A protein has these predicted regions:
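Transmembrane helix-loop junctions in multi-pass membrane proteins
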Residues: 4-5, 35-40, 80-85, 161-174, ...
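Membrane-interface loop-to-helix entry segments
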Residues: 24-31, 36-48, 171-178, 199-249, ...
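Flexible loop linkers connecting adjacent transmembrane helices
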Residues: 38-65, 87-89, 93-97, 101, ...
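N-terminal alpha-helical transmembrane segments of multi-pass membrane transport
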Residues: 1-79, 89-96, 107, 419, ...
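Alpha-helical membrane segments and immediately flanking helix-loop junctions
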Residues: 58-91, 117-141, 152-155, 159, ...
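Extracellular/periplasmic helix-exit of transmembrane alpha-helices
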Residues: 33, 114-122, 126, 242-259, ...
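Helix-loop-helix module between adjacent transmembrane segments
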Residues: 28, 32-33, 74, 103-128, ...
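Membrane-embedded translocation segments of transport machinery
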Residues: 218, 225-228, 233-305, 356
Length: 472
């Protein structure tokens, strides 16, 4: 029965993530990059200045621009950076990392465009509550006749929250890391649903479910406040630890980069296998890249819409940094540590791959290395769970309106999915996540192409008015 379900999910995943979606994702990013004249590269220094600027705009919104970025990062920096990269390299080879880079480079323009549109088309309700995201720029930008497309996006957004990035993958990654540290050999186990599970996985799953249930009482400002403190801290800690691995293995990095590029184009395969190997590397790399940085997925615009910014371009520039931080920095470092240590080719899966890379690359006892990774993963994944509850609630609100009782009921369903996550296989949770992500991205990418003229017009107006020169 389990094999039948796994096979079915695999077929659906291959269908959703076929060449059409891969082309759509890359083509949208390239199209926007060309129309914006490489803005993500040329205006990158300005984006950095805006991110650290204390000169906040007095615009309508619920949180600061930096807080909106941190809210988005709290949802994007999660298991995708640690476990997702590992699963991509194990499934698609080292070349998958190359395609993650390509998707991120053009995806930065995609992230800029979607967050700009989110601020432009956001709605202020009578009580002053700010709502926005792809559903609003689809409806208000493309026209009321496309409200059906906005609703499809919202439905898929709920699916990603309940079954993808928001719950299953995060809790599964956390409990697996806890299990690897406390009971790697599953000495203490309990039989549930016909399978043996480590007691530590069961207990940690229950504890984390309870913690999430308690935290979800808060709203956006609470999530933003927590994110501003936790996200930068955990990112710095993780980067420093991986830098140690790369520093101690610096002589192996050139060979690893060659292996990544060769793997990206199937150069180590022969004959017709070259094309097949390249497609698999592209599929896994881009899919995990979307999972990790969420560029084009349509989630970051929901957070960006709440920013206290009257200039859409300013928020777009700040928000696009999320893709750079997430993929170009954090995912790259994880991927390189996995490739240079050879952990990807040892028959392991999921968090065990990254754990092995840490144990092989750090000058610490194995238990210490596993503990460091476990702590990082707990922080990464926990904030992602909170961020995606917010995203998926906004999707639900778009469909049914602001109904507190329905939202409360949804939160209980969300919590129930978190409770279930630890007992699913690594392959199942990541396959389901990929399927949901692909479906959610399609309507958003269509909207970005349709509204690209608006993005270009707003961008040109911003720089022609010299607004960027007013930055102190």
């Amino acid at each position: 029965m389990l094999n039948t379900i796994t096979d079915f999910l695999g077929k659906v995943d291959n269908f959703v993530w076929g060449l059409p979606l891969i082309i759509l994702i890359l083509a949208t990013g390239v199209f926007l990059t060309v129309r914006l004249r490489g803005l993500q590269i040329i205006r990158f220094p300005l984006a950095i200045r805006y991110m650290f600027s204390s000169d906040e705009e007095d615009g309508s919104g619920e949180v600061s621009s930096f807080a909106a970025l941190c809210t988005a990062l709290s949802a994007t920096i999660g298991t995708g950076n640690i476990v997702g990269v590992a699963t991509a390299i194990v499934s698609g080879g080292p070349g998958a990392l190359f395609w993650m880079w390509m998707a991120a480079i053009v995806g930065t323009a995609t992230k800029y465009a979607e967050c700009l549109l989110a601020v432009k088309y956001r709605v202020v309700e009578k009580d002053g509550h700010i709502i926005g995201g792809p559903f609003y720029y689809i409806e208000n930008g493309m026209g009321k006749q496309f409200r059906w497309l906005a609703k499809i996006f919202a439905v898929f957004g709920i699916m990603v929250g309940l079954f993808g990035i928001g719950t299953f993958t995060q809790i599964n990654g956390i409990t697996s890391a806890v299990g690897n540290f406390f009971d790697a050999d599953i000495v203490h186990y309990i039989n549930l649903f016909g399978r043996d599970y480590s007691i530590t996985i069961v207990i940690s799953g229950i504890i984390l479910t309870v913690f999430v249930a308690l935290v979800l009482i808060g709203g956006l400002k609470r999530i933003s406040n927590v994110a501003q403190v936790v996200v930068p801290f955990m990112a710095i800690v993780y980067v420093l630890v991986v830098l140690i691995i790369l520093g101690l293995n610096i002589t192996k990095i050139p060979a690893a980069l060659i292996e990544i590029v060769e793997g990206a184009f199937g150069l180590r395969a022969f004959g017709g296998g070259m094309f097949g190997a390249m497609i698999v590397a592209m599929q896994k790399g881009i899919a995990r890249g979307i999972f990790s940085n969420e560029a084009g997925l349509g989630s970051a615009p929901i957070a960006a819409a709440a920013a206290q910014s009257k200039e859409e371009v300013r928020q777009g520039l700040i928000s696009m940094l999320g893709t750079f931080i997430d993929t170009i920095i954090i995912c790259t470092m994880t991927g390189l540590s996995i490739v240079i240590t050879g952990a990807w080719d040892m028959g392991l899966e999921g968090v065990a791959v990254t754990t092995k890379a840490f144990q092989m690359g750090l000058p610490f006892p194995d238990k210490v290395a596993a503990f460091i990774l476990m702590i990082c993963l707990v922080f990464f994944a926990f904030t992602t769970i909170l961020g995606w509850d917010y995203y998926s609630e906004k999707c639900l609100e778009y469909i049914i309106g602001n109904k507190p009782k329905a939202i409360t009921a949804y939160r209980w369903i969300y919590i129930a999915c978190i409770f279930i996550g630890p007992y699913m296989t690594v392959q199942a949770v990541w396959t389901i996540a990929d399927i949901c992500n692909g479906l959610m991205a399609i309507p958003n990418l269509i909207a970005l192409i349709a509204l690209s003229g608006v993005v270009v017009s707003e961008t040109n107006s911003f720089f022609e008015r010299g607004v960027h020169k007013q930055l102190k």
